[in-house]
Amino acid sequence: MAQSLKDLAGRLPAGPRGVGTALKLLLGAGALAYGVRESVFIVEGGQRAIFFNRIGGVQQDTILAEGLHFRIPWFQYPIIYDIRARPRKISSPTGSKDLQMVNISLRVLTRPNAAELPSMYQRLGLDYEERVLPSIVNEVLKSVVAKFNASQLITQRAQVSLLIRRELTERAKDFSLILDDVAITELSFSREYTAAVEAKQVAQQEAQRAQFLVEKAKQEQKQKIVQAEGEATAAKMLGEALSRNPGYIKLRKIRAAQNISKTIAGSQNRVYLTADNLVLNLQDEGFTRGSDSLLLKQGKK
């Protein structure tokens, strides 16, 4: 285009009249190029645009999608919105149902409603997040947290998060905002309440330990009673057996001596024990008679 203008200027006659004509052509070409550039704009991916008209204001029925668009220079101005979801973290101190101070933080994922961009611009402008989100989040948090005790905020955290999301979503609709996600990222209490909770947990653990020791003592007592009853029964049976046949104790001695002999035989050292060392007293005639009589009775059985 510049070369064409030079060629055109070369064909013009020399002198003041020719220079003036060349300047007019240059100005006209520049104005045309400027007008073309100002008449075209691009809406990038993840964006939407609306028109502001100098005569009629915001055009309510025009929402431009992504791509190349045209406008009337000086009369129409495109206003571009980013409609992609953006995260924002908001913290708010509030009070619980039992009057405990709670510091709670939310991560909110929001985006504007593309179908309502013209009315949103008229009411809130482009900085809608700063105007709306802090106020409605604080309002909803105070309303929801006040329905729960401090302990319930911990044990029923999922229910609290669901209720916050439901109320915040409904509240955001009034401002043409869409909430894609709401999550509790932090939940803390005052130092006094935290210390009281820790002291309560320690007391509960000590009480449980004391209860365990009591139950253990009871079980040990029952075990001793059962053991004592068993020993008494065994002693009674042993006494009855001895009264019926005195040779029973002699037989027990023989079996004990056999066990001792087996143990000694299995060791590496060699030890020789007599009947007296094994406490058998084999020379006693009563021992022999009692043992034979007991063995004879067991053989008959």
UniProtKB/Swiss-Prot annotation:
Function: Protein with pleiotropic attributes mediated in a cell-compartment- and tissue-specific manner, which include the plasma membrane-associated cell signaling functions, mitochondrial chaperone, and transcriptional co-regulator of transcription factors and sex steroid hormones in the nucleus. In the mitochondria, together with PHB, forms large ring complexes (prohibitin complexes) in the inner mitochondrial membrane (IMM) and functions as a chaperone protein that stabilizes mitochondrial respiratory enzymes and maintains mitochondrial integrity in the IMM, which is required for mitochondrial morphogenesis, neuronal survival, and normal lifespan.
Any one GO BP annotation for this protein: mitophagy
Family: Belongs to the prohibitin family.
Alphabetized UniProt keyword annotations: Cell membrane, Coiled coil, Cytoplasm, Membrane, Mitochondrion, Mitochondrion inner membrane, Nucleus, Receptor, Repressor, Transcription, Transcription regulation
CDD domains xref list: SPFH_prohibitin
Subunit record text: The mitochondrial prohibitin complex consists of two subunits (PHB1 and PHB2), assembled into a membrane-associated ring-shaped supercomplex of approximately 1 mDa.
SMART domains assigned: PHB (SM00244)
Classification via SUPFAM superfamilies: Band 7/SPFH domain
Pfam families: Band_7
Annotated GO CC locations: cell surface; cytoplasm; mitochondrial inner membrane; mitochondrial prohibitin complex; nuclear matrix; nucleus; plasma membrane
Main location: mitochondrion
Cellular location(s): Mitochondrion inner membrane; Cytoplasm; Nucleus; Cell membrane
Transmembrane segments: none
Necessary for transcriptional repression as annotated region, ranges: 19-49, 150-174
Gene source species: Gallus gallus
GO MF annotations, alphabetized: protein homodimerization activity
Protein name: Prohibitin-2
Coiled coil residues, start to end: 190-237
Domain of life: Eukaryota
